[in-house]
Amino acid sequence: VYRKAEQKAIIKYVDQNTGETLENDQVSGKSGEAIDYSTAAKIKYYEDRGYVLVSDEFPAGATYDTDASVDQTWTVTLKHGETPVGPNDPHNPTDPINPNDPNSPTYPATDQWKKDVTSTVKYVVSDGKATAPADNVQNAQWTRTLTLDKVTGKVLSSTPWAANKANYDAVPTPGLTGYYADKGSVASKTVTQENLEETVTYNPLGNLVPKPETPNDPNFPSTPEVKYPNDPTDPSK
């Protein structure tokens, strides 16, 4: 009586990036019988963890062969998927890269691809007897796009940092009655990846005090001190 030989088949799942075998599925049956196996569920499992299918050697309708000395082997090859994060693809650092994977790596901190910077002009009154104008603050932003490995979460590459503008505007110094500023304006500055700051100081204007040619001249009229007026066109004068 002819008896069908017991056969074994192995389906290997291989990480193309590392060359490592992710796992081996082993099935067994009789020679000539259909192999009751599908790679679909396992491929979906790895796709949920950031992999992309490269090739699947396991054929539809596969049967066990008649050679018991050699195991039938098929390879399913997968590679690491990639995904961007940046101004056009923003994500929170707590967001999973692979939402269907409970152990998914998360996106990197936002400051890895976005930096907000400022240029601030501070106004100070040297004698503290007047209220200085409010600080002038201008904003700029640097961004870049990172490409991430979906399996590991590591950064694979990045575009150069780019600012949303090249320069901060020049800032005319506001006038302050009774005071002159040490700068008539603050010049335009190039946007850098650091915060910039400059201070404008207001000092009190001098007083005009009339004096008689002869001390204690009783005929010299009593005149109070006269403040020098501000230059209406230049707060530094």
Predicted segments, located by residue:
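Short, solvent-exposed loop/edge segments of extracellular or virion-exposed proteins
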Residues: 12-32, 57-62, 91-105, 120-149, ...
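Intrinsic-disorder/low-complexity peptide segments enriched for small residues
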Residues: 20, 51, 76, 146, ...
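Elongated, non-catalytic scaffold/linker segments and compositionally distinctive motifs
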Residues: 17-19, 23, 27, 52, ...
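Long, non-catalytic architectural segments outside compact domain cores
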Residues: 38, 196, 233-236
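Surface-exposed interfaces of beta-sheet-rich extracellular modules
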Residues: 37-69, 158-189
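Conserved "repeat-terminator" motif of extracellular CCP/Sushi domains
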Residues: 1-14, 64-118, 122-124, 187-213
